[in-house]
């Protein structure tokens, strides 16, 4: 049996741009892609913290160090510049690997710079001003 597990997430990134007239996808700063172990073309789910919208798309590489989180194509109807989003990637693991796998969890600041990098999906950094689910 394979289990679909959290592979990585970028938590509470700020959308910097939205372009309705683009072929699709989400543009992500290459530094954030590295931190979250995302590859160009990899499927991600985007959750908009501000309005609850959820969608599935794929990642394209943005300029390194730019902080870009760009919503492209039809998704720009749902997610707008300034919105806070969570980008989530999942992986399929066999049962043994799923029980020991540690995801990449990336918290960012308002400029989409890495604040904290860890493996606990429920961890909340002190600077995040969020409630821990634990």
Curated annotation (Swiss-Prot):
Pathway the protein takes part in: Cofactor biosynthesis; (R)-pantothenate biosynthesis; beta-alanine from L-aspartate: step 1/1
Modification Pyruvic acid (Ser) occurs at: 25
Disulfides per UniProt: none
GO BP field: alanine biosynthetic process; pantothenate biosynthetic process
Major enzyme class: lyase
Keywords: Autocatalytic cleavage, Cytoplasm, Decarboxylase, Lyase, Pantothenate biosynthesis, Pyruvate, Schiff base, Zymogen
Active site residues according to the UniProt entry: 25, 58
CDD domains per UniProt: Asp_decarbox (cd06919)
Cell compartments where the protein resides: Cytoplasm
Cofactor binding annotation: Binds 1 pyruvoyl group covalently per subunit.
One Gene Ontology cellular component annotation held by this UniProt entry: cytosol
Reported function: Catalyzes the pyruvoyl-dependent decarboxylation of aspartate to produce beta-alanine.
HAMAP family named among the record's database cross-references: PanD (MF_00446)
Record text on subunit structure and interactions: Heterooctamer of four alpha and four beta subunits.
Protein name as catalogued: Aspartate 1-decarboxylase
Source species: Mycolicibacterium gilvum (strain PYR-GCK) (Mycobacterium gilvum (strain PYR-GCK))
Gene: panD
